[in-house]
Every structure is written in structure tokens, then in C-alpha cells.
């Protein structure tokens, strides 16, 4: 099961800020090897997985096959995006929690 956000869903700013704080705390506490590139004026985070030493293809395989989540591959934005994935935090908190928990489980054995 892969989670996505319907085109008709919308979040108030307070929800977006709560989601941002949740992602920051989750990564710091549970996945400190994943660095967060803070967005400027957007609800899309760049997650830096380079510390795992995976190729762009390996990173996508772990995310989609092991974690069952679909993130935008950073490599789609050029070679400088290799090792990164883009996370949309403009979704309900339950989806964000589920997705990050799946990513955590997939990466804890790497």
C-alpha cells in the first residue's frame, strides 16, 4: 500500500507546521543518519540519505519495495539530487506517521 494525498485534500497552516515539527523530531530521534534540508516557502522536504551509501536506484528500491512508500527521487532534479528523496508533508498526520514509520523499519537493518 502506497500513501498519497487526494487532489481535494487541504491542510490549514497549523497542520503544516505541526507536520514539519513532527518530521524534524522523528528524523532527529529515530533516523539521525537522514539529514533534513529545510524547505523555504514550500511543504516539500529534501531528505538526505547519502550517509547510507546507496545509489539512486537502490534508494528508490528500498523506499518503494521495502518501505512501501513513494517519494520523489532527488535524482530527477539532476545529479546533485542523488542520494536524496523529496517528502511532501502536506498530508494528514496519520499518513505522515505511517510513511515515516515504514521508512524507519526499512532502513533500520541497513
Locate predicted features.
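Conserved glycine-rich beta-strand-loop-beta hairpin in the small C-terminal domain of fold type I
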Residues: 16-24, 36-48
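PLP-dependent enzyme catalytic core of the Aspartate aminotransferase-like
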Residues: 62-71, 77-110
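Short amphipathic alpha-helical/adjacent loop interface patches that line ligand
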Residues: 13, 20, 100
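Single conserved hydrophobic/aromatic residue that forms the stacking wall/gate
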Residues: 1-9
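A short, small/polar-residue-rich loop/turn motif at beta-strand boundaries
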Residues: 55-61
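Hydrophobic C-terminal alpha-helix "anchor/cap" residues
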Residues: 27-28, 63
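Short beta-strand-to-loop capping motifs
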Residues: 47-51, 89-91
